[in-house]
C-alpha cells in the first residue's frame, strides 16, 4: 500500500 496515503498499516 502507498505510504503517502496510509503511513503505516
UniProtKB/Swiss-Prot annotation:
Residue numbers carrying Arginine amide: 9
GO CC annotations, alphabetized: extracellular region
A GO BP annotation: neuropeptide signaling pathway
Keyword entries, A-Z: Amidation, Neuropeptide, Secreted
Bilayer-crossing regions: none
Domain of life: Eukaryota
Record localization: Secreted
Signal peptide interval: none
Chain's role: Myoactive peptide.
UniProt name for this protein: Callitachykinin-1
Amino acid at each position: 500500500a502507498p505510504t503517502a496515503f496510509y503511513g503505516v498499516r
